[in-house]
């Protein structure tokens, strides 16, 4: 009888020891995964801060920030889901009895799921590198409206189409170079043109005045509305030219099947183009400009 009790006690002790080792191993693995989650969240936060700093410096515009935020939100959602699983595991691992009871049914599957997420960490970091590299090279190109449009015009005349193509060619070339650097990734390139107007009015009763009213679908409009509309029409006209230029250069993009291109043309009206310039006037050629931005982001 004593031998049976001794053997039973030894067996119980061995089971307890094995259980403690498994619990300790699970806790250690979970701690490492949670540390990685925190590190990745810090990386995402750092990129967001970098993007906002670039926005304040006029190196990028709000459209680019929105797209970066949307891309980072995908990763944040994945990390939040992983952290929720980690929290569930932490609750179970607090109690040895609960751990032993749920080890095979809950603990191991959750650890396996978290480990798979962790194994893709290097892959996600490489995507963050693309975003950070894009922010490092980000800048705007400025063009005077007079280079493309006649006074009071919003369509590029035939004799200035080649000038527009030459002006925008370096922009497309820079975008192409960056895109090709990361051609192994599925990615989206965004070209943005923002049109601006100064504070001078548009003569009432003229052809342009009535054309803009037709575009606005209004019988009359304030100066600000008219300037907003003409800046929008000019931006869209330049986007059309940019699209044609891209199509001519499309064969220069590597792995083009992994690349999507989107174009955004927006009129900013009488908004001030560059926040760091503090001495803009109402009638000011520095406000009659177009700003061009681009970004390439991993999908």
Located regions from the model:
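N-terminal targeting segments with Sec-dependent signals, encompassing both cleavable signal peptides
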Residues: 2-299
């Amino acid at each position: 009888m004593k031998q049976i009790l001794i053997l039973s006690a030894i067996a119980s002790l061995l089971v307890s020891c094995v259980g403690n080792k498994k619990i300790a191993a699970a806790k250690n693995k979970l701690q490492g995964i949670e540390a990685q989650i925190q590190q990745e969240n810090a990386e995402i936060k750092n990129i967001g801060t970098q993007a906002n700093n670039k926005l304040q410096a006029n190196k990028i515009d709000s459209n680019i920030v929105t797209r970066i935020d949307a891309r980072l939100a995908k990763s944040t959602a994945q990390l939040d889901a992983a952290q929720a699983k980690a929290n569930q595991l932490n609750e179970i691992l607090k109690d040895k009895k609960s751990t032993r009871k749920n080890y095979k049914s809950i603990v191991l599957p959750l650890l396996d799921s978290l480990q798979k997420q962790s194994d893709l960490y290097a892959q996600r970091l490489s995507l963050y590198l693309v975003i950070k590299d894009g922010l490092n090279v980000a800048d705007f190109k400025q063009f005077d409206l007079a280079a493309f449009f006649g006074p009071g015009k919003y369509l590029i005349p035939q004799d200035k189409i080649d000038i527009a193509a030459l002006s925008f060619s370096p922009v497309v070339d820079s975008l192409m170079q960056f895109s090709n650097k990361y051609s192994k990734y599925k990615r989206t390139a965004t070209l943005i043109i923002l049109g601006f107007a100064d504070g001078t009015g548009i003569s009432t009763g003229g052809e342009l005045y009535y054309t803009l009213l037709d575009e606005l679908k209004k019988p009359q409009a304030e100066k600000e509305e008219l300037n907003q509309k003409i800046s929008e029409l000019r931006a869209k006209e330049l986007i059309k030219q940019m699209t044609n230029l891209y199509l001519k250069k499309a064969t220069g993009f590597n792995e083009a099947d992994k690349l999507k291109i989107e174009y955004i043309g927006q009129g900013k009206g009488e908004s001030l183009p560059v926040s760091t310039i503090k001495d803009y006037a109402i009638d000011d050629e520095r406000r009659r400009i177009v700003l061009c931005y681009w970004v390439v982001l991993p999908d």
